[in-house]
Every structure is written in C-alpha cells, then in structure tokens.
Amino acid sequence: MATQLIDLAQQTRAAAQKLGTLSLAQRNDALAKVAQALAANQAKIVAANQADCEAAQRDGIAPALYARLKLGESKLQGAIAGIHDVINLPDPVGHLQLHRELDQDLVLKRVTCPLGVLGIIFEARPEALIQITSLAIKSGNGVILKGGKEAIQSCTVLTEIIQTALQDTAVSPQAVTLLTTREEIKTLLSLDQYVDLIIPRGSNAFVQYVQQNTTIPVLGHADGVCHLYVDVAADLSKTIPIVVDAKTQYPAACNAVETLLIHEKIAPEFLPQIAAALTAKQVTLRGDAATQKIMPVQPATAEDWRTEYSDLVLAIKIVPDVEAAIAHINTYGSKHTDGIITEDAATAQIFLNEVKAAGVYHNCSTRFADGFRYGFGAEVGISTQTLPPRGPVGLEGLVTYKYHLVGNGQIAATYSGPDAKPFTHRDL
C-alpha cells in the first residue's frame, strides 16, 4: 500500500508542477468545467451522500458529525456556487510583491507561486472536497484528499466527476487524488518529499494526531472554543439575537460560541432574558456559581471552559469587568474567534487589542468567521496559529513566494571590502 501511495503522490506532484505553469484562463476554464459537471450530476451526488448518511445512522453516528456529513441539494448548490466565486477571485499566482533595483541591471523581484501538493484530511463534510479542490486548482496546487470513512461514497463520486471533467481541460486529472482507507493516513503524513502542506479538518483529537505525526507543515486548528462577552454597556436588544445566532445557527460549526461571559452588573437582568431565548432553541445551559444564584442551571465545571461542545450546550460565567473576560478567554480559549458586545467604544478597543485570537469581533456573531463570508470565495480551513496564514485561509494561504534576481554579470565581491560599490536599493 505504501508503494502504491508513493506512486500516486509522485503522479500528483508531476501534475501539480504542470498545473503551476498554467495561465489564469486555463485554470479558470478547468474550474468552470468542474462546476458544470457537478451541477449536471447533482442527483447522483445526493444519492451517494444519502447512502453514506443511512450507513452512518446505522453505525450510530454522533448528531454533530451527521450534520456535517449531510449534503442536501441546497448545500451542494452552495458549494457549486462557491466554485464560481473562486473563478472570480484575483489570480494568487505570479503576484509581484516586491520590485527593487539593487544596482544598475541588477533587479530583484518577489513573486507568488504555488506551494506544490496539498494533503487534505477531513472528517465528514463532503462539500469540503469541492471547496478545497477549487481553491487548489485556482492556486496552481495539486491535492491529495482523504475524507472520513463515513463520507466514502460521497467523496468517491465527487472525485470521479471532477477527474472526468478535468479530462477536457489543461489541468491533469491526476492533480486531484482521493485516498479511501484509514491506513493511508499514516503513509500520507510521512510523504514530506512529495507533499508540501497538510491541512486537517476534523475533531480536536484528530487534528492533534496529525500535528504530532508528521514533519510536513500543518495548517489548521485543534478546536474551536469561541466566546462572547456581554459588557455592562451592551445593548440587550442587540445582544440576544447575536448570542442566539452564535450558538444555534449551526452549533456543529467550529465558529459557534461555546462560552458566554456576562458582566456582573447586568447579569440579573440579562440572564433570564437570554436563558429564555436559548432554551426556546433547546440549548442546555451550564453556569458557574454566580450564575446558579440567579437562575437554575446545570453546574459548570473547569472542564466546561475548555470544551468545544459542537452541540446545543452553552457554558455561562459571570465576570467583574472586561479585563476578567479577556483573562478567561486568553486562558481557556482556542485562539479561534471571540467577540464583545458593547456600546462603549473604548472598552471594545481594549478587547479587540488584548484578546489573543485569530478573529476578534465587536457587536456581531462569531459565525462570521468563515472564508466565504470574508469574501475569500471559500476556505481550506481556519488557522489558529500566530504565524500567518491566520484565521480563515483562502487562496492567499495556498501560495508562497520566491525571489527572482536578474543581473548582467554582477558578482558579490564587487559589493564587499574597502572599495565596495554601494547598492542603489531603489524600489521600481
């Protein structure tokens, strides 16, 4: 199996090298044909996904994972529309970032270029395959995909349709490869000679496993423990819809809020209101001791502050001020997305400056942490690392850059020693 996978990786790398040289028009043409093929085969895709869903239900799949697995017509159509959004995005390849004369006839350029081959490992979410493949092709990268076993039929059908569509384009079908067995993950993680970036999308434990078992750079986040802090100066009529949306609009999402922090001065008034709104949406509430004194809720433990529920569960804590809220978030948060609700601009700015997260919001739902909503067309994942790329990662995170230096016989010795010729260092 290892030898076969190495052969596939070599083929993908060769296809990626050619893909990286194609024009924007050629890459966009390939994407348009992929979108057309997916649209023409919607019934086939939905049927394959339905078979996956039925098998998953027989196996007792968790509700949060089932929600990710389910690919209905609307979700599929949204993914196809996302391909057209990617087509309309600027070309990330060949972008001139620096153009500088070092000396006469010695010119330096920094130019963006594809990474090479992406290894994408994801659980459930078959539409992620569509999003990632479109971004990979647009950015000139090959991609090796490994979906979860629960989505095997969906991913197989999607990949077959995409590869068939690419046969009529300048992009080789071998630029997109699908792995189908769990055993292949370990081998994939060892292919640092052929794979340039690993992007895992899945549970906390799964992402940590990937991070700990490869020498290939990893882009991703291990969990999404997101917070909202309701300040003493919050407009409660604005606050309730924000909190309800952040928790219930899609609770399985990594940008759904998991902990609600409330300023102690407004807690007696606000808690009953938000509790009524959330329980009407079947949300289970867990609270600290101060919360329990105001209303009956399940006790929150220390473990709750670190938990990504991915479900209709919300932990609540009452805090004395914004600094306490920031301290809690920076201690227990996952550096994903955290927000403040307040009409006090100075307090909001303190929060925006001091919370150590990829996304820090003011007066809006955490659910906006998404590449599509940011106008990236789609995203390959969300990175919570401090170094870039950070937050929702779209095309800009799938390219690197190289330096082109064009001279006319210059040598380094001319520019060193007591009679060194000075550089001009003039931006062009």
UniProtKB/Swiss-Prot annotation:
Major enzyme class: oxidoreductase
GO MF term set: glutamate-5-semialdehyde dehydrogenase activity; NADP binding
Documented EC number(s): 1.2.1.41
Catalyzed reaction equations: L-glutamate 5-semialdehyde + phosphate + NADP(+) = L-glutamyl 5-phosphate + NADPH + H(+)
SUPFAM superfamilies linked to this entry: ALDH-like
InterPro entries assigned to the protein according to its UniProt record, in alphabetical order: Ald_DH/histidinol_DH, Ald_DH_C, Ald_DH_N, Aldehyde_DH_dom, G-glutamylP_reductase_CS, Glu-5-SA_DH, GPR_dom
Protein name: Gamma-glutamyl phosphate reductase
Organism: Picosynechococcus sp. (strain ATCC 27264 / PCC 7002 / PR-6) (Agmenellum quadruplicatum)
Gene: proA
